[in-house]
UniProtKB/Swiss-Prot annotation:
The gene is tolB. Part of the Tol-Pal system, which plays a role in outer membrane invagination during cell division and is important for maintaining outer membrane integrity. InterPro entries: 6-blade_b-propeller_TolB-like (IPR011042), PD40 (IPR011659), Tol-Pal_TolB (IPR014167), TolB_N (IPR007195). The Tol-Pal system is composed of five core proteins: the inner membrane proteins TolA, TolQ and TolR, the periplasmic protein TolB and the outer membrane protein Pal. They form a network linking the inner and outer membranes and the peptidoglycan layer. It is found in: Periplasm. GO terms for biological process: cell division; protein import. One of its GO terms (cellular component) is periplasmic space. The lineage of its organism: Bacteria, Pseudomonadati, Pseudomonadota, Alphaproteobacteria, Rhodobacterales. It holds the Pfam family PD40. It comes from Dinoroseobacter shibae (strain DSM 16493 / NCIMB 14021 / DFL 12). Residues 1-24 form the signal peptide. This is Tol-Pal system protein TolB. HAMAP family: TolB.
């Protein structure tokens, strides 16, 4: 862990820089968490309840501050100091910070904020971040303006800004997750697409339970979702508009063909997927505008689960062409593939990190399932989890956290969503209303 100055960050939701007495004054605070070195002791941070500047903002002020504290603590990098430990309350957003009182309770960072309801009914949220031990603000304050229904997003935006200033990396709190919501007995599950905030709040269903759905994936802009649907009786790739909740089959499968495991290209213009015909599965690429389809692999093996590199030049996929299920990387235009997994066991469901540096995967070995990561050349393999059944990894927008499905054993076993950071620490269950599987993390919301 280091202490180093970070400059102010500009973010959306009608964000404005604040000016005033607490603005950065040329005395930069050197507070910083260096994530790559591994964080064992979370950084103590104080997030007092935000001040309500208008009577109607009272509950929003407390709730938004709680979202900020929960986001930061949930990352595993911070430890929120309980409110009953505070020595001096924050009574004015513009009053000078009493650094000695925060040092006395070992707070290394302090987040202050205020909330008001404007004449047009919108919420106005202001916040500042302070490096307590340097007696200085960390960058300029920010102000967000949005509808009252967006109050949780405003909390996530504040938390993302704090995370970014202290770690030097992008946040991931203002994002959503699409997943498969499951109900019913294990041998007759009903499956629906659902979407929620990254932390399990605001669950909404995108499909009904009339057809089984699998493997949803967000578009790069987060406004569309690809998934596999059994509405026609056989698996078919379907494209859903998140805002209108309208879906359409991409219609590539014919006769006895089955198409599944779709994923967008980084530019959102094409899709890679598996197509099975006559018992042989290969990987194809489809242009979404023209419908033109290109076969990328042509072997007798089962080849599936393709995932683009962030630059769109390569594809990682799973194949049993060597006799067991392993991971391969090939050009995005097809051609010769190189094997990158060589450890014991079987590897599957590879997903390229949005940072481009790692590939997440599922591994089965000696009766256990694992979520792991490796370099894109297959080196430095690390297993992050181990259980009866862990599968379906998906990356947070900043490439620092992986969400996945964990299913318990036995007749009553059911899947749940979990997250873990890429060091293998901070394993957490993501709350969902019922059984849930196949998570897919969106990019940061605009």
């Amino acid at each position: 862990m280091k202490r180093a100055f970070l400059s102010a960050l500009s973010v959306g939701l009608a964000a404005l820089f604040l000016t005033g007495p607490a603005q950065a004054q040329g005395n930069p605070g050197p507070l910083r968490i260096e994530i790559t070195e591994g964080v064992i002791e979370p950084l103590p941070i104080a997030v007092p309840p935000f001040l309500a500047e208008t009577p109607a903002a009272s509950q929003f002020a407390r709730d938004i501050a709680q979202v900020v504290a929960d986001d930061l603590e949930g990352s595993g990098l911070f430890r929120a100091i309980p409110e009953n430990a505070f020595i001096s309350p924050i009574t004015s957003f513009d009053s000078p910070v009493q650094y000695a009182d925060w040092k006395a309770i070992n707070a290394q960072a302090l987040v202050t904020g205020s909330v008001s309801v404007a004449s047009d009914g919108r919420l106005v949220v202001k916040f500042r971040l302070f490096d307590v031990f340097s007696d200085a603000p960390l960058g300029k304050g920010l102000q967000f303006v949005a509808s009252q229904s967006s109050w949780r997003r405003m909390g996530h935006k504040v938390a993302d800004a704090v995370y970014s200033r202290i770690t030097g990396e992008g946040g991931y709190f203002d994002s959503r997750v699409v997943f498969v919501s499951e109900t019913g007995p294990k041998n007759a599950r009903q499956k629906r697409l659902a979407i929620m905030d990254y932390d399990g709040a605001n669950v909404q269903f995108l499909t009904d339970s009339s057809a089984i759905v699998l493997a949803p994936r967000f578009s790069p802009t987060g406004d569309r979702v690809l998934y596999t649907s059994y509405a026609t009786g056989r698996p078919q790739i379907t494209l859903l508009d998140v805002n209108s909740v309208r879906s359409q089959g991409l219609g590539s499968a014919q006769g006895g063909e089955m198409s599944f495991a779709p994923r967008f290209s980084p530019d959102g213009r094409s899709v890679v997927f598996s197509l099975t015909n006559g018992g042989n599965s290969d990987i194809y690429r489809r242009d979404l505008s023209s419908g033109a389809q290109t076969r990328l692999t042509a072997t007798p093996a089962i080849e599936t689960a393709p995932s683009f590199s962030p630059d769109g030049r390569q594809i990682v996929f799973e194949s049993d062409r060597s006799g067991s299920q392993q991971l391969y990387v090939m050009s995005a235009t097809g051609g010769e593939a190189r094997r990158i997994s060589f450890g014991p066991g079987r590897y599957g469901t590879p997903v390229w990190s949005p940072r481009g540096d790692l590939i997440a995967f599922t591994k089965q070995n000696q009766g256990r399932f694992h979520i792991g990561v490796m370099r894109t050349d297959g080196s430095e393999e690390r297993l992050l989890t181990s259980s009866f059944l862990d599968e379906s990894p998906t990356w947070s927008p900043n490439g620092r956290v992986i969400m996945f499905t964990r299913e318990t054993s036995g007749a009553g076993g059911a899947p749940s969503l979990y997250s873990v950071d890429i060091s293998g620490r901070n394993l957490r269950r993501v709350p969902t209303p019922g059984a849930a599987s196949d998570p897919a993390w969106s990019p940061l919301l605009p």
